[in-house]
Structures are given as C-alpha cells and as structure tokens.
C-alpha cells in the first residue's frame, strides 16, 4: 500500500502498478475542437468558396471576362461582449463577433480593394467546454459515424457475390463487385450493375490492352494441371524457346502451346490475363458487339478476338442506357452524368479522412500492382506508399479495389458459400479423372464447364463446380483467409467533434449564401462606389448556425445535476443524430461492445433504454487524432522490458500487436517476470512468450470512462449492475454537507478537478484574504518570496466564487473556500470546493452505517429502512433552486402593471411584497396560506375589457383615478407543494435586455431555494447498481444496534446481492468500516482493489480493540457482527454484515412527483384526462386495473371510473353541478371513447347501429 495525494486529502491506495501517464484534461477534446474551428475551420469554409465570380456560371469564360471576384483572405475573432454569468441571468447567448478580411478584384483591370467585414456573432465556448444559448447552458455531443473510405463487406456474401464500396463524405456510392457464378467484374453505379471494363473505358483506360494488362496472373510453367486448366487464356508476354519466339503477347494459350511450354526448361512461369478479367472482357464484347463467334466453339482459338472493338462512345452509351433507361442515350449527357456522379468536386467529396482511409486500404494492392503490372523491383515497390491526394475518385482507386476482389475469391471461396460437401468431393474426383487426366478442357470457360457438369453428372449447384476448380487450381497453395471489413470496428469509425459539426453546418449554409453574393456582384459597376460589407450579408447564415446550437439533436441541454453528470455529458459519444443511426434501428451489432473499443470507448457506461449501445462515453485516456479516429496510449515493450515510452495507437493499428494488461508483473527494472503472459491480439486472448510482447496498457483504468472508474471493486460487480452504478452516480443530488467516500478509487480528485467547479490556484502564493465569496492570493516566485510589481504593490490573484447559482436541473451550485488566511498554496492546488465536492474530491453522497438484514418486511423488493438520525443530522438534505418568471406585456386594452395594489387579496399575502409588488429577498414563502391561497411572488394586474360604465363607476373613477379601473389579478404565485426562501430577484426592462420580446415591458424572475430532507419514497443508491426506495423512517432508538450501542443508520435487503452479482458493495462495506475505525481514507483503483484478506484480517483486529468482534471468527474473519433489536434489546438470530457504504440520494425525489388532480385538462380526441404532473393529469386506470375491479365485482366504482371520472363529457359536467348543489350524482352516460370507436368503424365503411333491449334503435348523439 502507498499514500497518494487526492486534492487536499491523502489516501492509502491498494494500487500496485506505476502509471507513467498523468490523466489528461478530460474536457480538452471539446475545447481543442471548437478552438480549431474558430481559428482555422471558419477560414477553410470561406476559402473553399473563394473566389466568387460575378460571371461564375460560364466556365468557358477567360478569367479577365469574369467581371468581379470576391475572395476571403483571413478571419478574426473578437472578444465576448457579455460575461457568461450575465448571459445566464439575462437569457442571452454567450457569443463573439467574427470578422473576415475580404478582397474584391476587378478581373479586367486587376484593381483590388480589401476591407474587413463584420460577419455576425457566433456562440463562444466557456472555459468549462459549454455554450450558453438564450441563457441556458448547453453541450454539443460528439458524434461517431462510419468513416468515409473503401470497405469490402461480408454483406455481399448474402447476395452470393464478393464486393466492396467507396463510401464518400458526400455523393453516390461506387461499388466494385465480383460475381463468382459467371466470373465477371461489375461496377455498381447508382445501385445498378455495369460491366467494370465498360466503366474503366469511360474514366481513362480507352484501349482494351491497357485494361487487360491491369489484371495479370502467373502460371507455374512446370505445373501441368495448372497450365492445361488455363488453356484459352490470353498471354501477357512473348514466349521464347531459346532465341525462338513461339508465342506473342495477346496470343491465346492453346493446348499444344501448353504442352510445348512443359518441355522447355528455361521457362519458370508465364504471365496471362487473369481468367476473371478475361471473362469480363468477353462479356463486355457480348454486351456491346452485335457480331459473335457462332460456330467457332469447337475450334481451338490461337488469337485474341475483338480487341478494341468496343469504343469509349459505346461504353458511355451502354452505361447510360443501364442507368437511365427512360432517357434517350446521348453522348454528352452520358459524359456529364458520369462525371457528376463520381468526379465532380461539387457533387462528390471523399474528404481528407476518406482519402486517407482509401489510400491505407489500397496500400498493399498498390505494391502488388507495381510489381505485377509496372514490373518494379519488389524491394523498391515495398518502400512506396499509395499517396493519392485527390478528394474525388481516381481510375487507379477503382482498379486496385477490383484487384483486391480476386484475393477474396481465391482465398475465401469454399468457406463463404454453403456447398454440399459430398457433391464437392465427388466433383473433385470427376474433375481430376475426366478433365485433368484425360485433358478434355479446351479453355477456362466456366459457363461451358458448368453446363457439361449439369448435363453429364447431375450437379445441382454451379458453386460446387467453381469450388472444385478453385480447389484443384490452388491444391498446392497455402493461402490464408482474408477478413472482411466490419462497420463496427473502431478503425472504420470516426468521431465528429463539436468544431467539425459546426463547420459542416456553416459550410452547408454558406453554399446557399454564395448565390446571393454572386447576384450582388453582378450589379457592381466600379470598385470605388461599392462597400464590400454591402455584398456580404450572411446574417441569415449566422442566425441558422445559432439555430444549430439551439435546435440540433446533438446540441443538448446540459445535464447539470452534479459535477460528474456535467463532465460525462461533455465526454459523451452518440451514434444517433443527423447522418448517424436511427434510434429505432434493429442492428444489434451496432449496439454491442466491440473489442476495438478497448481503451477508447467505455464498455460499461451507456443508457438502459432505446439508446443502449448507441450512446457511450469516452474512456479516460482517449485522444482524437486529426482525422477523428480514437486513439489510446500504450507503453512500448522491447525484448520483454517495459519502457516509459508511450505510443498512441488507432484501433486498426493495434490489430497485429501483442498487448498485455497493466497488471502484468514486472520487476523494479521493468522486466516482465513470467516467461509466458496473457496478451490481447486483435479479438483473441493468447498466452505468448514475454519476448514477443509489443505493448502494455498504461493503466488499469484505461478501458473505462470517468464514471465507471469511480466504482470501487468494479471487478467484483456484474457488468449490467456496474452500468446502473455509473449511470446513477450522474443522478446524485449535491448534498448540503458533502462528504467524500471512505472507500474511493483515486479518481475522485481527477473528476472534481476537471469538472470546473473546484477552484484551482493559478500560481504559487500565500492566501491573503478569504471570505465566502472570494479568495485573494498573494503570488510568490519559485523561491517562495512574495512578488511585487514596479510600483511596490503586491501581485495578487483574486478568485470570485459562485454563490447559490441555479443549475439546469434546479440543483444548487455553490462554492466555499477550503483554505485559510496565511496558507501557502501551490499552482494547481484546490482552494475552493464546488457542489458535491469535499476537500477537492468528488463527494456525491455520504458514508452510511448499513446492516444487511431483513426488518419486518420494510426492505422487501429493495426498499430501504432508514434511521431518523439521518434527518436530524441533515445527512441527505439537499437544496434545490427553482426560478419563477412573469412578464408585464402591452395588451390590447392597455399595459399590464406590476404592483402591490392587487384587488381582493388579504394583507397576509401582501406582507412580503415591496412597494413595486415584488417579493423581497430573504422572505420565506409557503405555497398554501390557508385554503386556496398561494403565496404571491410578483403582484401583477391586467386590464379587463370594460363595457358601458354606470354613473357610480364614473364617480369612483373620477375620485380614485386609475386605481378605480377594473383589472384582473394575474399575479405570479408559488405553485402548490413548494416552499422555500427567496434568494434572488431579477427585474429587467427593455433598457437591460434589447431582445426582450415583442410587447414585453418588464421581466421579473424570482429564485426560490427549497430545502429537501429525506422522505419516504425518495430513491437512494450505492455505486454498484444497488438502488432502492425509502420505505420507512424509524426512530434511531428502534434501529438495530452494535455491541457498543451504536445504532445502524440504514437497513438493506441481503437478497439484493446474490442474484445481482454485485459483490463489490460487500467489500466496500467491510473496507468502509475499517476506514472509519482507523481514520484512514482508502483508494482501491479499478482491477487493483483490495483483496479479502487485506480487508477482513485488519478489520477483525480493529474491531477486537473496541469490543466489536462479537459474531466474527478469529481464524476465518467474515466481517459479521451480532446486532440487537433496538425495540427489545434482544440479539438477532444470526450475525449480520455491518459497515460503512457510500450512499447517494438521487434526483428522483418523491415529493416532486406527487400531485393531486381536481378538474383539469382533457385530451382533444378521447376526452380523457391527461397524464403527468406537468399537465395536471390524472391517474390512469388501465386494462389490468379494470380486471382487478371486475374481479371484486365493484360495478358502481367501475362505472364511475370509466365514465364521469374519465370521458363521459355530459355526465362529468352534470356530476360537477350535483356536487356543488349537494344533490345526488346522476346516472353515467356514454363514454367518448365509445363514440370514437363507432366513428372509426364507420370510417372503415361499416354501418354500426345501436339497439336497446326492446329492439329500438338508439341515436348515440343524444346521449
């Protein structure tokens, strides 16, 4: 065990591994991304559309004839006008002005004019990585999407094909497909299959010789079977017997030639066109050429037929016919259509990351291309990389992709398709006997061969024939199988961070504004008379970008329940959203944990509902590279020795490396101790020699998110319970008295530090002044001497603390100093705690003395029995701040007035209002002052419509003036069920906030702080997914008590542990008690937690010292103790596990959920009461509740529930009148839902009529 510093506290850590890498800034990803957008991305977008010509529509014009050109040279970001706190208070957007230097050029004269123009205000990120939009703090969530690139997918196997596709950032997919049935290559254009060679002719490979040369294969000149099998193939080189040429390039390999080659010793291999490429070429001839080779089938060919017979024009027209069969094929239209589809930068964008991925995927194919096609030396070729940089597709991209398909065909064939094994064995035998040994084959014509087999041997599957041929032709080759690309691999996924998301939006909108700028350019006559600012009016763009922050699915109202929920929200990664997956998607693979997520995305933290697996969290050490790929760090291992060199790897880069966990035993010099160690290799776990290890994890916390790494003994918890634990920590309410956990993980300090709510010292210094709202530190230099400026004044840092600020979820944000005057502080030390922090550490809950035992059924179904002591000591008391708002508007009948002069209101309700009618700060307000009277927060009256005034009213008006006017009381009142203290009042008029809203004269906001103590029905939880509801609050003298008389504070159900498999809570309970007894604070890092014997033995010794060991076994300590019943003093039958567990109070507070409905709103169609507190709704009586009432025979109750209490409109009105007049309630009528049913049936053309018991027709509309 070692001591570690956590904030201003020291913990005893059970961690044994050395961590060479400090935990990075956990909000850095958000900050860096948005800073890059403002500094570079904005200019990138503007330059992408520069220059804008006034005559841009005519591409054939010379530059000098293009009129005027506008281009953007640079951008500048101004300073924020209003600070974040003022923006939140006034409901403004925290933003900065952006300027661009634009240059206008007269293309004819060359004259230029440069000017800095104002583009508008754009939201600015706060220091904590958030945005303030219209006064609300928001976060833009990172989005994970499939990266643009080239993918060879197993999905094609379902269609019995091999294929890959180019996935662009913008534009159509281009597929490359190999159909193994007819051995032909196809290009998939716009969803239609076209012969690949036809397509290659349209993109630069005009001659057939050029195309066929791209697809060579080599035959072993000594392999008789292989040579004879490929009779009919096209030669790609001259063949010599000594000095005598016996065959030319482009000749056909005949049977005689093959036999002759076998007898020549000097020839090692011959180069031919790959059979599939030859087949594709012949298919192309059949498609386009009208003439054929009828009658020549039996004659052996010696020369290639139809070379260059298909022209480029033929290719264009044939493709256009395929793609647009409804249009008349024209060569210009065909060229334009194909060019726009894949080669026009305005329509097709592979993006930089897409180009990088394509280059990476084609690297090996390019090396083979250089060796086989270009004839380069293999050693030299392997040094080269495929370094294309075009953002549209290039012909060679498509060629290399199609060549890769041959590898899939040759190496995977038998495995990928279901072939009858008996039939296959039989075929191989026949093939060897009948064709190879008797030399019957004349050419590699798959179609003929298949038809012969079908006719002669009754073969049912074409694939069996092809598999047999493939088996024979590769009988001596050991070819490893090639894996397919998977979309779920993180090497094929990238993260769009906030900067990129905003930049994409900006780019999309600027494309629209470009036309407006162009139109204004056409109106210019001379440079001297024009202002560039008048040309550029892109305020609509800026306002729409602002709308992105307010409305986009990825811009979310920040989860601000506690510092952890805020930190997690900023590190969230979503697969849903624009351009991502849909929440309704049934693709389970996309939700599953993938091995490539190790160290990049947390395998634990994800929501439980429809978003499970789609929304995840970044792991602690994750970084995002310039392309958006997730990287994780590893320590380099050389010859079995672990070095301190840290390397960041992408998911696809680590595939072939052997990586061992951080817990692998090493000696003091870093040498791995065991000779064989467990290592990860791709998705496998293997036992490998230590010399073969390449990397080691940097930390045991590496795979997990911040939230998951805060769970002690995580390794002892089932994954689904750990998921609940990490999610529920984010719902913990900051308590009045924060207390850090006795048993932590060491991450509490890191989480609090990165949340932005713990104030850190910016420089070394000595604390000069401290009060509740500010801290002043006198700086010191590196020698500890106080610093003064040139005038002899002390150099000080002043820190302003947040006091009683309302969070997005109505919890309280409050900072308090944790240093005293005269304290020395170092740079980075915590000097003030925020909400839910204690001495710089995250403190979401309280350490509670718990006992695991049943108690009178009060802990049935995970319910929790708590002691009155927790209420008396304010252990789970929290403060919630709610804001109430009202506006005084200009109405048709005159202005509304905020006043204390409210008609027909008692003095009791007005006593806390000031002379302006606004509640005074510090007043304690209760929602109910007697029956039906709610506390008034803001007095407001609205003019009433006045009819003809009587003479008496005229006299009153003349005497009392406006006060005699008829007004309606529209005061802002405190809602039912709320009480608290007014802590702040904000009053704004149009002088304070320019955009107050049309017709709004004054805005008043009243902040009320409520104290919420623990109550029955409140939800409590531990950190291990162990959650429950308070069932009863017992006097502390009735609670079970320890041998020394200490009553336990909480009783939990022991049945909640075995089936849930979250044993971590038991270990935490034991270690928590040890911490309490010894006064130490422990840290048990993830996967390095304390072992049982490290806890139970010292715990027994400490308990024995204090006489608390009764019920435990000295030889085999179990941590149990004999408890006595507080009511009787009798001991319970069995010893009980007792200890300190860290418990959280969750934001689901019962008092906030309970409400009562009198008469409220009804839904429009069904006329049934709405549901939920926000709609003042009723309790739903569902189908099963109806069964229950039926089972009891409660006919009258049931009739009442289904009619007058629900949707019998006439009946409920009559019942209301009857109650008011103290009369009997009338008989119920017809429910509205019955009428809706009748209407629906009539809508289906069914004539529904109703009859009474006498057979008389009933008119339902009368009831």
Swiss-Prot record:
Its EC number is 2.7.7.6. One of its GO terms (molecular function) is DNA-directed RNA polymerase activity. Pfam families: RNA_pol_Rpb2_1 (PF04563), RNA_pol_Rpb2_3 (PF04565), RNA_pol_Rpb2_45 (PF10385), RNA_pol_Rpb2_6 (PF00562), RNA_pol_Rpb2_7 (PF04560). GO terms for cellular component: DNA-directed RNA polymerase complex. It is an enzyme of class 2 (transferase). It comes from the Bacteria. Keywords: DNA-directed RNA polymerase, Nucleotidyltransferase, Transcription, Transferase. It catalyses: RNA(n) + a ribonucleoside 5'-triphosphate = RNA(n+1) + diphosphate. One of its GO terms (biological process) is DNA-templated transcription. The keyword Kinase does not apply. InterPro entries: DNA-dir_RNA_pol_bsu_ext_1_sf (IPR042107), DNA-dir_RNA_pol_bsu_external_1 (IPR019462), DNA-dir_RNA_pol_su2 (IPR015712), DNA-dir_RNAP_su2_dom (IPR007120), DNA-dir_RNAP_su2_hyb_sf (IPR037033), RNA_pol_bsu_bac (IPR010243), RNA_pol_bsu_CS (IPR007121), RNA_pol_bsu_protrusion (IPR007644). NCBIfam families: PRK00405.1, rpoB. Belongs to the RNA polymerase beta chain family. DNA-dependent RNA polymerase catalyzes the transcription of DNA into RNA using the four ribonucleoside triphosphates as substrates. The RNAP catalytic core consists of 2 alpha, 1 beta, 1 beta' and 1 omega subunit. When a sigma factor is associated with the core the holoenzyme is formed, which can initiate transcription. This is DNA-directed RNA polymerase subunit beta. It comes from Thermotoga petrophila (strain ATCC BAA-488 / DSM 13995 / JCM 10881 / RKU-1). The gene is rpoB.
């Amino acid at each position: 065990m070692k001591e570690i510093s956590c904030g201003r506290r020291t913990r005893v850590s059970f961690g044994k591994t050395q961590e060479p890498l400090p935990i990075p800034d956990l909000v850095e990803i958000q900050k860096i991304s948005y800073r890059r957008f403002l500094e570079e991305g904005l200019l990138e977008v503007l330059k992408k559309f520069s220059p804008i010509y006034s005559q841009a529509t005519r591409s054939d014009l010379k530059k000098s004839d293009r009129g005027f050109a506008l281009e953007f040279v640079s951008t500048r970001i101004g300073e924020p006008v209003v600070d974040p706190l003022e923006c939140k208070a006034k409901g403004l957007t925290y933003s900065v002005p952006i300027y661009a230097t634009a240059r206008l050029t007269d293309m004819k004269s060359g004259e230029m004019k440069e000017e800095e123009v104002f583009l508008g205000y754009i939201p600015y990120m706060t220091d904590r990585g958030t945005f303030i939009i219209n006064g609300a703090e928001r976060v833009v969530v990172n989005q994970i999407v499939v990266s643009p690139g080239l993918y060879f997918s197993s999905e094609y196997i379902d269609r019995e094909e091999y294929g890959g596709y180019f996935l662009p950032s913008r534009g159509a997919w281009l597929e490359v497909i190999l159909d193994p049935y007819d051995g032909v290559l196809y290009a998939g254009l716009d969803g239609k299959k076209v012969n690949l060679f036809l397509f290659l002719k349209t993109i630069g490979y005009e001659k057939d010789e050029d195309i066929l040369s791209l697809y060579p294969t080599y035959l072993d000149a000594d392999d008789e079977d292989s040579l004879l099998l490929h009779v009919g193939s096209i030669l790609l080189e001259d063949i010599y017997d000594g000095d005598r040429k016996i065959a030319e390039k482009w000749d056909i390999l005949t049977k005689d030639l093959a036999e002759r080659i076998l007898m020549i010793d000097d020839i090692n291999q011959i180069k031919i066109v790959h059979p599939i490429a030859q087949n594709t070429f012949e298919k192309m001839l059949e498609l386009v050429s009208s003439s054929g080779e009828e009658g020549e089938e039996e004659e052996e060919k010696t020369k290639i037929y139809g070379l260059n017979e298909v022209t480029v024009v033929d290719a264009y027209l044939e493709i256009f016919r395929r793609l647009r069969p409804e249009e008349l094929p024209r060569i210009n239209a065909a060229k334009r259509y194909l060019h726009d589809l894949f080669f026009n930068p305005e329509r097709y964008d592979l993006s930089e990351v897409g180009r990088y991925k394509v280059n990476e995927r084609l690297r090996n194919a390019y090396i083979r291309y250089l060796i086989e096609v270009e004839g380069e030396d293999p050693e030299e070729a392997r040094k080269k990389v495929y370094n294309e940089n075009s953002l549209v597709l290039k012909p060679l991209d498509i060629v290399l992709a199609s060549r890769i398909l041959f590898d899939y065909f040759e190496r995977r064939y038998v495995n990928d398709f279901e072939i009858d094994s008996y039939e296959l064995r039989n075929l191989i035998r026949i093939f060897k006997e009948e064709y190879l040994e008797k030399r019957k084959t004349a050419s590699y014509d798959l179609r003929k061969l298949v038809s012969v087999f079908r006719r002669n041997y009754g073969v049912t599957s074409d694939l069996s024939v092809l598999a047999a041929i493939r088996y024979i032709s590769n009988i001596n080759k050991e070819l490893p199988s090639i894996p397919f690309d998977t979309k779920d691999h993180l090497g094929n996924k990238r993260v769009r961070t906030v900067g990129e998301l905003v930049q994409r939006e900006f780019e999309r909108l600027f494309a629209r504004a470009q036309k407006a700028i162009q139109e204004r350019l056409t109106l210019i006559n001379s440079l001297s008379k024009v202002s560039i600012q008048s040309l550029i009016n892109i305020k609509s763009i800026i306002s729409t970008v602002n709308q992105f922050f307010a409305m986009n699915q990825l811009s979310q109202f920040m989860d601000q329940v506690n510092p952890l929920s805020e930190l997690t929200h900023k590190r969230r990664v979503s697969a849903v959203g624009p351009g991502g997956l849909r929440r309704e998607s049934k693709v389970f693979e996309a939700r599953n944990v993938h091995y490539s997520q190790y160290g990049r995305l947390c395998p634990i933290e994800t929501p439980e509902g429809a978003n499970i697996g789609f929304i995840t969290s970044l792991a602690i050490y994750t970084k995002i590279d310039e392309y958006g790929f997730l990287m994780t760090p590893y320590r380099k291992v050389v010859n079995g020795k672990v070095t301190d060199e840290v390397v960041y790897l992408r998911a696809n880069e680590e595939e072939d490396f052997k990586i061992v966990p951080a817990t692998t035993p090493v000696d003091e010099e870093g040498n791995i101790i065991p000779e064989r160690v467990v290592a990860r290799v791709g998705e496998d776990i293997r036992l490998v020699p230590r010399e073969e290890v390449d990397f080691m994890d940097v930390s045991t916390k590496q795979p997990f998110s911040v939230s998951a790494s805060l769970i002690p003994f995580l390794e002892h918890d089932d994954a689904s319970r750990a998921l609940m634990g990490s999610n529920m920590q984010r719902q913990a309410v900051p308590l009045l008295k924060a207390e850090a956990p006795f048993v932590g993980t060491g991450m509490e300090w890191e989480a609090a530090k990165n949340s932005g709510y713990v104030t850190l010292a910016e420089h070394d210094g000595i604390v000069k002044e401290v009060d509740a709202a500010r801290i002043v530190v006198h700086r010191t230099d590196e020698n500890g001497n106080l610093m003064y400026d040139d005038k002899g004044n002390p150099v000080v840092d002043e820190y302003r603390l947040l006091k009683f600020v309302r969070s997005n979820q109505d919890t309280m944000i409050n900072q308090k100093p944790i240093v005293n005057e005269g304290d020395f502080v170092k740079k980075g030390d915590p000097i003030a705690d925020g909400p839910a922090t204690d001495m710089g550490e995250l403190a979401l809950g309280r350490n509670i003395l718990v006992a695991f035992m049943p108690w009178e059924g009060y802990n049935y179904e995970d319910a929790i029995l708590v002691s009155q002591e927790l209420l008396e000591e304010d252990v789970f008391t929290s403060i919630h701040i709610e804001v109430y708002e009202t506006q005084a508007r200009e109405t048709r009948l005159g202005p509304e007035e905020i006043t204390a002069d409210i008609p027909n209101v008692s003095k009791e309700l007005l006593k806390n209002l000031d002379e302006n009618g606004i509640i005074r700060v510090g007043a304690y307000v209760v929602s109910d002052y007697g029956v039906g009277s709610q506390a008034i927060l803001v007095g407001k009256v609205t003019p009433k419509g006045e009819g003809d005034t009587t003479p008496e009213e005229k006299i009153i008006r003349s005497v009392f003036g406006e006060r005699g006017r008829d007004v309606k009381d529209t005061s802002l009142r405190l809602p039912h069920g709320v009480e608290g203290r007014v802590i702040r009042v904000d009053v704004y008029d149009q002088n304070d906030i320019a955009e107050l809203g049309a017709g709004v004269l004054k805005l008043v906001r009243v902040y009320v702080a409520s104290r919420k103590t623990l109550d029955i029905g409140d939800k409590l939880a531990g950190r291990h997914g162990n959650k429950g509801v308070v069932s009863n609050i017992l006097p502390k003298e009735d609670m079970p008590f320890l041998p020394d008389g200490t009553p336990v504070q909480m009783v939990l159900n022991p049945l909640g542990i075995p089936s849930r498999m979250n044993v971590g809570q038991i270990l935490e309970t034991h270690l928590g008690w040890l911490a309490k007894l010894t006064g130490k604070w422990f840290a048990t890092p993830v996967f390095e937690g304390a072992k049982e014997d490290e806890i139970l033995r010292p715990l027994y010794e400490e308990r024995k010292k204090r006489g608390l060991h009764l019920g435990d076994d000295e030889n085999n300590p179990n941590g149990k103790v004999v408890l006595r019943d507080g009511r009787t003093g009798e001991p319970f039958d069995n010893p009980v596990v007792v200890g300190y567990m860290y418990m959280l109070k969750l934001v689901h507070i019962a008092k906030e959920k309970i409400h009562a409905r009198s008469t409220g709103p009804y839904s429009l169609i069904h006329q049934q009461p709405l549901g939920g507190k926000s709609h003042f709704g009723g309790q739903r009586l569902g189908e099963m509740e109806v069964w229950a009432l039926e089972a009891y025979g409660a006919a009258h109750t049931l009739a009442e529930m289904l009619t007058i209490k629900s949707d019998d409109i006439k009946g409920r009105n009559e019942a209301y009148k009857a109650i008011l007049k103290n009369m009997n309630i009338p008989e119920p009528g017809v429910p509205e839902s019955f009428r809706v049913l009748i209407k629906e049936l009539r809508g289906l053309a069914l004539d529904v009529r109703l009859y009474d018991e006498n057979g008389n027709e009933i008119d339902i509309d009368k009831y």
